[in-house]
């Protein structure tokens, strides 16, 4: 089901996504003296610039809209050779299938696009 056919639903999603994405997400260091913003932390750099094609506002808007429409948001963590996360790539929720078994609720994710299936194990943020 898509909100494009309902202008009221689309307007509500627009307000939600915009309102959520306006305040910036920050990384803090907690200490006895108080919380301190760490601007140069790798997680902060990633939150500010999730990937070359998206701003932080666009990524946050995607998360809110996906959760409101589909109940889930999926973000692929692209890693460098050292294992550090260097990009966050949003995945279309309708193309992600959550797999589990009797022992584990979630064992893997499958992303299906254009007839291809990509199995994703640990490199996904599921909201």
Q: Where do the PLM segments sit?
A:
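Structured, contiguous alpha/beta core segments that scaffold functional sites
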Residues: 1-126
């Amino acid at each position: 089901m898509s909100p494009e056919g309902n202008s009221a639903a689309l307007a509500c999603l627009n307000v939600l996504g915009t309102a959520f994405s306006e305040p910036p997400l920050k990384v803090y260091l907690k200490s006895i003296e108080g919380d301190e913003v760490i601007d140069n932390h790798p997680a902060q750099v990633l939150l500010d610039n999730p990937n070359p094609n998206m701003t932080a506002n666009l990524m946050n808007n995607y998360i809110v809209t996906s959760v409101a429409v589909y109940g889930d948001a999926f973000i692929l963590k692209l890693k460098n050779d050292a294992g550090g996360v260097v990009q966050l790539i949003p995945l279309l929720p309708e193309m992600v299938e959550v797999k589990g078994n009797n022992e584990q609720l979630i064992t893997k994710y499958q992303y299906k696009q254009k007839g291809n299936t990509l199995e994703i194990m640990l490199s996904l943020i599921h909201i």
